Amino acid sequence: LLCLVGSEMCIRDRPGIGVHPAIVYTADLCGADVIMNLGGVQAIAAMTYGLFGNAPADMLVGPGNQFVAESKRILFGKVGIDLFAGPTEIAVIADETADPELVAFDLVGQAEHGYNSPAWLFTTSKKLADYVMQRVPELIADLPDLPRENSGAAWRDYGEVILCDTDEEMAKISDEYAPEHLEIQTKNLQWFHDRLKNYGSLFIGEETTVAYGDKCSGTNHILPTKGAGKYTGGLFVGKFIKTLSFQRMTKESTKEVGAACARISRYEGMEAHARTGDVRLRKYGFQN
């Protein structure tokens, strides 16, 4: 967990290893004056309440496990947050033109995140579906201990391969799932790009993969999960912009605005609201 609060950062170390030098270097490049060796719920508490002599945060941003998500939910209101994110998800839309080996690798690549990370394949090709269902367990078995354990549990409990009749059916099912990460590996890439509406981030063509978005290509990987892609997108720069509204009117404008306010308020049964318009109409000579 790397968190920026003004010029302070919280960095989670790795048991028995410590903080990776590359992370410390990155923090320095970002202008950190203070680095706290904290992660998870402890870091969230420290940032929210301004512990250890540091200023409290106005906003908490970033992914984490279920404890981090619950902490952000509890503290939402005292501080702003980006979104409530559940376990990471991947879906792949693939037809007979897709490379089944790439599809299998990509599904395993995201299942590695944790035991409850869904991996879904929507395909019109039974041949590809059969290959992937055989190949994924082989790829999982070849992983180191922890990734193998996570991927195996995720694929066993949350993996799905759905055989569809048409491209339209694949698109419809995908929009119903609204996956966090969605790959398209089909002949007609542009059609799916134009047709699909619900997802966190879209990866078009076999040349890209979800791991690129996670690690290095530049698209934000703090994304909606659990179907939230139906109503929101991922983190973007606008989340850090606070919009403020204001109004200033002339006395002459009160003739129309004050009268409209009074009428609307009375339709709603809010007499005190209406009278704030009436009193100005009288003061400025527009009403007896």
PLM regions and their residue ranges:
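Single conserved hydrophobic/aromatic residue that forms the stacking wall/gate
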Residues: 1-6, 11
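Short acidic loop-to-helix transition motifs that present clustered carboxylates
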Residues: 16-20, 38-46, 189
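Active-site-proximal loop->helix
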Residues: 17-30
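Conserved NAD(P)+-binding/catalytic subdomain of aldehyde/semialdehyde dehydrogenases
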Residues: 29-118
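Flexible, glycine/charged-enriched surface loops at secondary-structure junctions
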Residues: 57, 80, 117-122, 142-154, ...
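Short loop-to-beta-strand entry elements in the cores of soluble alpha/beta enzymes
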Residues: 61-63, 83-94, 107-133, 151-162, ...
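C-terminal core of ALDH-fold dehydrogenases
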Residues: 175-288
